[in-house]
Amino acid sequence: MCVRLRRRDFLFLAAAAAVLRGEDRPKRDMLSRSVRPEDLEMPLSGFSDYLTPAEHFFVRAHVYVPTVNLSEWRLNVGGSVASPLALTLDDLKRLPAAELVSVLECAGNGRAFFEPPVPGLQWGHGAVGNARWRGVRLADVLKRAGLKASAREILLDGADVPLGSMPDFQRSLPLEKALDPNTLLAYDMNGEALPVKHGFPLRVVAPGWAGDSWTKWLTSIRVLDQEHDGFWMKSAYRHPGRPVAPGVAVPLDRMRPVTNLRVKSVIASPLDGAQLDPGSPTMIRGMAWGADPVAAVDVSIDGGRVWKPASLIASQRTRFGWRQWEFAWTPQQASYFTILARARDAAGNTQPLDQEWNQSGYLWNAVQRVHVNVGSAVPKPAIPEQAYASQRPPAAFNNCLLCHNDDVIRQQRLTRAQWTAEINKMTGWGARIDDAGRDALLDYFDRLRP
């Protein structure tokens, strides 16, 4: 029997099939931080949604998005276990399901604000999102495999393939975090199959921890009886854990892995440089989050001299999700104002006015400052744009631009010594740059500095 479908029915079925396959909706109005691999930041307008839609959710990828054939995909569980497993997605969905709302934030969110500047993607405020995650508890999968008494860490690996001789992106979780009932292996995001760019078909959800522990495209769980010493644990995603003088590098062996997020808030409205009218009611709005639940947000409109409590949206009270806050203000006189928002969590941690510096640019949580102009015809002075050199040496075309787009390079504000360290890292991963090419690159990077 032949059934004729109307066009709208066909489009509906095609869209439904795409959801089941975890296909991505187009990312709109996002800020590009890298084209190859693709890294996208959510603009401040995205902080108006309690649950961040997938099409507005930030994207962080160290390598290119892998192609996953679901019929062949398996989650392999091995190492220090009694019964190694090879689970299909259907196998996982037959286990008891768990669901929670949690913020996912890149460890480097806010890196662009560090002074002195530090290398890496120059994220502003938007390498973060809040979603409803559904899947199975990692603890249930480990229980099914049978942990041996020697188990110490859980090594996580995905289907993504390293570029050149770059080390495979593997992260480990301590046993305590892995067995936490809130740590999930998620297959759904906001009620739909995980989009490909967000880890389809399976990703780790480690609530309260930075995104480097939220492994995407998960294919392997290996139970270790000793601490994992791979590059992405011992050399990357580490920070001092204590105050250091700005510009002072700390040896890797004196740093520790990034784990818990820090309490912070973002002012989404009004925007920096906004023009307001005297006597016009203005609602100051934003989001606040951290590893612990947000307890309060205070707002100042005079640069931090006087603070007043903002209102938290009561319906958004969850253990790991962010909280929207708002503060009503009616400016009475023409002037420039500096608006600040400061969050406090249930553990008593308060957002600092000034940021502790670290060489990797991780865990930025200093109070944001938004400058608005009330009633004056004179606009707030614009920050001059950097003047970029137009001539790139061959070494840039043959090495840097094979993986990174030009904007990523232009966003950096590094010293010659910092660029030298970055080139050394790339040559260690297989980039071929002779001495003349190295000097040409360093001279070019010097010209990029404002």
What does each of the following model-derived ranges do?
Residues 2-6, 11-75, 81-82, 97, ...:
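Extended, aromatic/histidine-rich regions of cofactor-dependent oxidoreductases associated
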Residues 127-137:
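Mid-length scaffold segments of soluble, non-membrane domains
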Residues 299, 431-450:
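C-terminal capping alpha-helices of c-type cytochrome domains
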Residues 377-396, 428-429, 435-436:
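Electrostatic cytochrome c docking/interface patches
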Residues 420-432:
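Short microdomains enriched in Cys/His and/or Lys/Arg
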